[in-house]
Each structure stands twice: as structure tokens, then as C-alpha cells.
Amino acid sequence: MTPFGISVPASSGNVGPGFDSTGLALGLYLHLNVEDANSIQFYSDGESTPTENHFIWNIAENIANKHGIRLPACKVQETNEIPLARGLGSSASAIVAGIELANQLGNLHLTPEQKLQYGTEIEGHPDNVAPSIYGGLVISTVLEKEIEHIQLRDIDVDIVAYIPNIELKTSVSRNCLPDSYNRDYAAKASAISNLTIAALYSKDYKLAGKLMEEDLFHEPFRSELIPNFAYIREEAKKYGAFGTILSGAGPTMLSITPKGNGPTLQNNMSKLSLLADYQVEYIPIDYQGISIQE
């Protein structure tokens, strides 16, 4: 076996009002380095992990089983830059990594569409797995058993993330959402989402940022779970942000700011006393998606 590497970017789901349908790939990565070995070995950040208990390996075996093959003995070393349970798509990145691990070890020659299909079946929705596979901003939905998606690869903004030192499970954040919305409310929420995507495509980032903060699907309900939600949004605007939103289900928040302003915004926000325990990071948008290093 020729050694190879797999890199999968983080992702931010929803991007404001694009609830369960829009995601953005971000330049934090889950890396797998794979080499030949006499037995199956898996290491996470240098620590040996039993493969039967490892999520990524279990995903890889599941995909291999679908194709009627067994994965060969190998040594897999995982390193992960993506914070867990922070709304940055850590589970989706792990799913995509497992799918690609099976693809490479089993010579399955999976298409991106097949990877998206498998990832969506496992994750339950495509808004995080899609950008981790394709890169950029991806709008996607499941129609019957078919997944449709559109990718936007040219977004002239910078991203600054505010990552608190707390975890928030998606299941907890999802439980605070209403079971249904009345027709007028849903129509307005849908219109805001549609106009946000149109603004991004037309590069009207000022309008896009304004609309992102007008989400009605999830942020009004989840914001109560997020420390300093209103404060971060207000302060970021003072330093030039177009808008500030929850990343996925939270607790991380993201600011969209003019191209070139990211480092300045990051520097100013990191000095705020209320954010002393946060990682305030300027994170580039990833446009490559999953990548293989040989």
C-alpha cells in the first residue's frame, strides 16, 4: 500500500436562515494519514484507539460492507483541528473522512454524488456533509431519494469565529425548536432565506449580512442557549462585520466581514473582556472540500 492522507474541512451549517439546507466549508481540518501495517491500527492524536469503538473506522467498514469488500490491514493516524460539539460540523467531517477512507482503501471510485448520498443517509441531512465534500457554500436538499445541490465557490468575504469553551450537543439545541410554524411565519422565514442566497450570489454582502441576522427558523429559539449572543453581534458590527450568526446549532458564532477585514476584526474582538475564554479565530473559507495527499 502506498501511504496517503485524507483532509476534510470543517463546516458551518444553516448560514443564518438556510436552515438544514445551506452550509459553508471552513479552513479547519480533520486529517487521516494512512500506511501499510500487519494489523488494523487506529490512532487519534497519538493515542491508540480500538477500531470497534472508533466512529470513523466504523463508517469506513459500513461503506465497505455496502460494496461487499473487507478493508485491508493498515495504520490510520487521525489529527483533528475541528473543535467537537461547537457547531463546526465535526461529526459530518468524521463521516466524510470515513467514507473517503473506505473509498481509498477499497478502490471504490465513488463519485462526489455517491459520497454525498452516503453522508446524508448517515448524518440525516446534507447541509454539513455537502460543503465538507465539495468546498465553498453549498445549498442542498433531499428530494425523494435524490439529493440536489448547488455550489457557490466565489465568496468575497472573510470569516471570524467565536468559539466558546463550552460544548452544545446538536440534539439539545434542536430540542428547543418548535415542532411546526404557521403558514405566514414560515412564508416570511422562507422569503428571508431565499433573499439571503440571492444576495450572496449577487455579491451584495451588506444585504446578505443584514438578512442572515433576520433568521426566523432557528436563531430566535437557540440564541437563549448561547452565551453573549447579542453582545457578540453588536460588538462585531462596530468593527465592520456585515452580520454575525450561529454556526450550525451553536455555540460557536461566525461573523461575515469585508474581504481583508478578517484579521482586524479578529484582533479587536479578541481584546473584549467578555470573550477572554473564547477562541476568536480568523478562518478562511475552504473551496477545495475533501482532498487526498499521496
UniProtKB/Swiss-Prot annotation:
What protein name applies here? Homoserine kinase
From what superkingdom does this record's organism come? Answer: Bacteria
The record's Gene Ontology cellular component field reads: cytoplasm
The Gene Ontology terms for molecular function here are: ATP binding; homoserine kinase activity
UniProt-listed PANTHER family: HOMOSERINE KINASE (PTHR20861:SF1), HOMOSERINE/4-DIPHOSPHOCYTIDYL-2-C-METHYL-D-ERYTHRITOL KINASE (PTHR20861)
* NCBIfam families cross-referenced by the UniProt entry: thrB
Query: What is the purpose of this protein?
Result: Catalyzes the ATP-dependent phosphorylation of L-homoserine to L-homoserine phosphate.
Positions bound to ATP: 83-93
Q: Which family does it belong to?
A: Belongs to the GHMP kinase family. Homoserine kinase subfamily.
Instruction: List UniProt keywords, sorted A-Z.
Output: Amino-acid biosynthesis, ATP-binding, Cytoplasm, Kinase, Nucleotide-binding, Threonine biosynthesis, Transferase
Pathway involvement? Answer: Amino-acid biosynthesis; L-threonine biosynthesis; L-threonine from L-aspartate: step 4/5
Question: Which GO biological-process labels does this protein carry?
Answer: threonine biosynthetic process
Instruction: Kindly state which reaction or reactions the protein catalyses.
Output: L-homoserine + ATP = O-phospho-L-homoserine + ADP + H(+)
The record's annotation in InterPro entries points to:
GHMP_kinase_C_dom, GHMP_kinase_C_sf, GHMP_kinase_N_dom, GHMP_knse_ATP-bd_CS, Homoserine_kinase, Ribosomal_Su5_D2-typ_SF, Ribsml_uS5_D2-typ_fold_subgr
Main location as per UniProt: cytoplasm
